[in-house]
């Protein structure tokens, strides 16, 4: 399983993840974060993405709805104020855009706001399961103190009903799409020819 981080740590301890994807606003990681306040701003910023990298979007509900319809967008990133409606999640399933479910937003909030986030997470997972929406579970850590082990992340989301094997599959597929030269699409890969046994 891969973890998607929002910072570039100096020393990264072994937390049980296969590898890490660094989603940064400055394009020096494996992924690019685009923050937009309107669909028009999103389209303008997407045109500016030249590099081949995983593209994640952070924005209000209208921006997220627009993002799932854009071919260049790979994942809708999670944050405290993200709200995804039923139609956006259904569109994400049709357009193969992953939805990130992150642990760090629960660490940064408390009280009623945290309880509201728990309820929203439960509802999102119900719709994700209903429409088989691609999703990933991550820490989305913005600093060293928000890092958690793979087991902690998986156990947390499993408690709310997330299908962890599917989350692993979607994360692996997303990473392979950009960083595995033998990957074409699900079920199609370039195989290496072996000289032994060929007549």
UniProtKB/Swiss-Prot annotation:
Q: Pfam families, from UniProt?
A: RNase_P_p30 (PF01876)
Record's keyword annotation contains Protease: no
Protein origin, superkingdom: Archaea
State where it is primarily located: cytoplasm
Query: Keywords on this record?
Result: Cytoplasm, Endonuclease, Hydrolase, Nuclease, tRNA processing
Location in the cell reads: Cytoplasm
Cellular component annotations (GO), alphabetically ordered: cytoplasm; ribonuclease P complex
Q: Which GO terms describe its molecular function?
A: ribonuclease P activity
Q: Could you describe the subunit structure of this protein?
A: Consists of a catalytic RNA component and at least 4-5 protein subunits.
Protein name according to UniProt: Ribonuclease P protein component 3
The scientific name of the source species is Archaeoglobus fulgidus (strain ATCC 49558 / DSM 4304 / JCM 9628 / NBRC 100126 / VC-16)
């Amino acid at each position: 399983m891969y973890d998607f981080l929002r910072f570039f740590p100096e020393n990264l301890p072994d937390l049980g993840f296969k590898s890490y994807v660094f989603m940064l606003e400055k394009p020096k990681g494996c992924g690019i974060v685009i923050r937009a306040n309107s669909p028009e701003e999103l389209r303008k910023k997407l045109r500016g993405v030249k590099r081949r990298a995983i593209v994640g979007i952070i924005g209000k509900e209208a921006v997220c709805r627009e993002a799932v319809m854009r071919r260049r967008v790979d994942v809708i990133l999670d944050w405290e104020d993200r709200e995804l409606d039923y139609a956006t999640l259904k569109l994400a399933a049709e357009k193969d855009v992953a939805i990130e479910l992150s642990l760090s937003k629960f660490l940064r909030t408390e009280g009623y706001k945290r309880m509201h986030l728990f309820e929203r997470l439960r509802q999102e997972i119900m719709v994700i399961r209903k429409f088989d929406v691609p999703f990933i579970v991550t820490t989305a850590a913005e600093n060293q103190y928000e890092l958690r082990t793979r087991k902690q992340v998986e156990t947390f989301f499993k408690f709310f009903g997330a299908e962890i094997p599917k989350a692993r599959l979607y994360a692996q597929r997303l990473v392979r799409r950009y960083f595995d030269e033998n990957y074409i699409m699900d079920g199609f890969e370039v195989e290496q020819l072996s000289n032994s046994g060929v007549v």
